[in-house]
């Protein structure tokens, strides 16, 4: 009897597999970290083979833990770190270069050239994005220009490009299917989010051959079947979405005005704007939230590059903690008279500043500043950055008074009550943490299960969303104002170090 859906959650630092039952409860979870490579300042790479082997290993482990076989699994759903770029040989499957990760800033010069040549208005109008190293298009161009012979081979159709979902799908199907979904395509700088097609003008500007690009499908569709020797029998692959869009689905943010924020390596807030794309006046992105039955639902997005990775820095870079769960209790012991601010621009700054060149800084240090104050500043930096996104979304959304009065949160950092309470305090709004916090994986599972007939239509699925805890604002208005002013001053100081105020 088909009773489960398998979600592949391929993230920045680890690959995970989560088996969901038909009632969306979790049957098993498996996780495997893989190495990060930092060959130069601002460069971040992954070995595609590490992504692949860790994905297969976790799928097998989750199935073994739950005691299920392929005949028990209705479908596989894939969600993935977005923008991360893989280029591989169509015939052999060999990657031409390590995967260039979404955090990577090596293409800042390419982006500067595109802006200088006046291309940004056309790119932004069609893609809803800005010209920034974050997105896949300039990463593809860099690989083609940097690997000897790659550009000529790509023009002949010998090379394929894919975001991580596309690469995994190609491997899972034994090289039979080269496809992606609309959410991942919308993050490449090559896809017109209004027409739902790869755009010839954008391909020409970025110098990317059309032959490299995958077919673009709905987020819930039959993409193909896994080859039998991977799991013992074929399993249908029926759902794909980028990780942040999958979280929108998993959080059941199906109504315009609903907003979710996911806290993993980075932080990403998305506001559902319905069937109409809203052009941001406050340096947010306009993107596709999901595509079902050929109909696109759009979102405003704010992207923060450093959230959970600030806690990793406390652990791995400074040695202040041994595990992430220690951070909240440590921060709680900080000296309340100190005002230490961390601006964690380790790889530049994302929304709403968009400056790839600045680097992080600490402000307000005294002789008495210690581990507790640094932990406090690291956690609080995530809340301040979320506030910046929140304020920009309120300004952009045409009915701000009726929109996103509650923030739905998910991701690893939401386990910290300290951080979630501080987030509610600084936003001056309730923060809702759901019972099922694996919302990214749940979104992928839902998209796959919807196509397979396991899960109901979105409105009925939304009825199953359950609140675990609501964090209510408790900070005084005076304290909130003082702290936000201090954060704004710290950000100005960092931006001034590059001689500007962002893009």
Swiss-Prot record:
Which residues does sn-glycerol 3-phosphate bind? 12, 82-83, 134, 243
Q: Which Gene3D superfamilies match?
A: 3.30.420.40
Task: Output a single Gene Ontology CC term carried by this record.
Answer: cytosol
- The record lists glycerol as bound by 82-83, 134, 243-244
Q: What is this protein called?
A: Glycerol kinase
UniProt keywords (A-Z) are: ATP-binding, Glycerol metabolism, Kinase, Nucleotide-binding, Transferase
**InterPro entries of this UniProt entry?**
ATPase_NBD, Carb_kinase_FGGY, Carb_kinase_FGGY_CS, FGGY_C, FGGY_N, Glycerol_kin
Record: residues binding ADP:
12, 16, 265, 308, 412
Q: In which pathway does it act?
A: Polyol metabolism; glycerol degradation via glycerol kinase pathway; sn-glycerol 3-phosphate from glycerol: step 1/1
Family stated for the protein in its record = Belongs to the FGGY kinase family.
- Give the matching HAMAP family: Glycerol_kin (MF_00186)
Question: What PROSITE patterns does the record point to?
Answer: FGGY_KINASES_2 (PS00445)
Is this entry keyworded Ribonucleoprotein? no
The UniProt entry's GO biological process terms, in alphabetical order, are: glycerol catabolic process; glycerol metabolic process; glycerol-3-phosphate metabolic process
Q: Which GO terms describe its molecular function?
A: ATP binding; glycerol kinase activity
Free-text activity regulation comment from the record: Inhibited by fructose 1,6-bisphosphate (FBP).
Which annotated residues bind ATP? 12-14, 265, 308, 312, 412
Q: What is its EC number?
A: 2.7.1.30
Q: What class of enzyme is it?
A: transferase
> What does the UniProt function comment say about this protein?
Key enzyme in the regulation of glycerol uptake and metabolism. Catalyzes the phosphorylation of glycerol to yield sn-glycerol 3-phosphate.
Gene that encodes the chain: glpK
Reactions performed catalytically = glycerol + ATP = sn-glycerol 3-phosphate + ADP + H(+)
């Amino acid at each position: 009897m088909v009773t489960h859906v398998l979600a592949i959650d391929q993230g920045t630092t680890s690959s995970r597999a989560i088996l969901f039952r038909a009632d969306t409860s979790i049957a098993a979870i498996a996780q495997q970290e893989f190495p990060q490579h930092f060959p130069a300042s601002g460069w971040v790479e992954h070995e595609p083979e590490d992504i692949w082997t860790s994905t297969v290993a976790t799928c097998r482990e989750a199935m073994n833990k739950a005691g299920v076989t392929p005949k028990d699994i209705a479908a596989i759903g894939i969600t993935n770190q977005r923008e991360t770029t893989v280029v591989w040989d169509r015939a052999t499957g060999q990657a031409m270069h390590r995967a260039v990760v979404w955090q990577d800033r090596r293409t800042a010069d390419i982006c500067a050239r595109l802006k200088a040549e006046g291309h940004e208005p056309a790119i932004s109008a069609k893609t809803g994005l800005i010209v920034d190293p974050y997105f896949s298009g300039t990463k593809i161009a860099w690989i083609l220009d940097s690997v000897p012979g790659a550009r000529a081979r790509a023009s002949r159709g010998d090379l394929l490009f894919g975001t991580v979902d596309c690469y995994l799908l190609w491997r899972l199907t034994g090289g039979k299917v080269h496809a992606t979904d609309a959410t991942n395509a919308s993050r490449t700088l090559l896809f017109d989010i209004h027409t739902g097609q790869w755009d010839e003008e954008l391909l020409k500007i970025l110098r990317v051959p059309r032959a490299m690009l995958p077919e673009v499908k709905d987020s819930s569709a039959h993409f193909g079947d896994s080859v039998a020797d991977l799991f013992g029998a074929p399993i249908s692959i029926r759902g794909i979405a980028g990780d942040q869009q999958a979280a929108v689905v998993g959080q059941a943010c199906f109504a315009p005005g609903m907003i979710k924020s996911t806290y993993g390596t980075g932080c990403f807030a998305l506001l559902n704007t319905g069937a109409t794309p809203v052009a941001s006046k406050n340096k947010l992105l306009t993107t596709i939230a999901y595509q079902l039955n050929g109909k696109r639902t759009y979102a405003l997005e704010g992207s923060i590059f450093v959230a959970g990775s600030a806690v990793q820095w406390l652990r791995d870079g400074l040695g202040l903690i041994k595990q992430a769960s220690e951070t909240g209790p440590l921060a709680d012991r900080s000296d309340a008279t100190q005002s230490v601010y961390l601006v964690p621009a380790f790889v530049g700054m994302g929304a709403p500043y968009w400056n790839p060149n600045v680097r992080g800084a600490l402000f307000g240090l005294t002789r008495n500043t210690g581990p507790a104050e640094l932990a406090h500043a690291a956690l609080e930096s995530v809340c301040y950055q979320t506030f910046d996104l929140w304020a920009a979304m309120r300004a952009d959304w045409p009915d701000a008074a009726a929109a996103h009065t509650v923030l739905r949160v998910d991701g690893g950092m939401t386990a910290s009550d300290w951080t979630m309470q501080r987030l509610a305090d600084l936003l001056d709004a309730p923060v809702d943490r759901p019972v099922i916090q694996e919302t990214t994986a749940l979104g992928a599972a839902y998209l796959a299960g919807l196509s397979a007939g396991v899960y109901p239509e979105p409105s009925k699925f939304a009825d199953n969303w359950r609140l675990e805890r609501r964090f209510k604002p408790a900070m005084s208005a005076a304290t909130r104002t003082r702290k936000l002013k201090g954060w704004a001053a710290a950000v100005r100081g960092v931006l001034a170090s590059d001689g500007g105020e962002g893009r």
